[in-house]
Amino acid sequence: MGLSAKAESSGTCGPNLKWHLTDDGVLIISGKGEMADYSVPYNSAPWRYFGVKRIIVGDSVTTIGEYAFSNCSSLTSVTIPNSVTTIKEYAF
């Protein structure tokens, strides 16, 4: 059995938030509070090149960070709950 390289498919995206990318391109943001801010190209969101097709933001997320989803050109659906009160510049 050999080892194979696999792209990072989960991690943190804020002090109390986690992200997970499913095999079929669904990005799930979970936890409570604010997302981190990102910038292009030096501090890009970790899912930037993963071909995200759908985003589901969890019920306790309050802020979507700068440039969080700015390069997700394959998006077909985004679910944002009422708990999100701030969407920062260039988030999409």
Label each PLM-derived region with a short phrase.
Residues 1, 14-15, 41-44:
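A generic local structural motif
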Residues 3-7:
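Sec/Tat signal peptide C-region and signal peptidase I cleavage site
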Residues 35-49:
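Acidic/polar low-complexity surface segments
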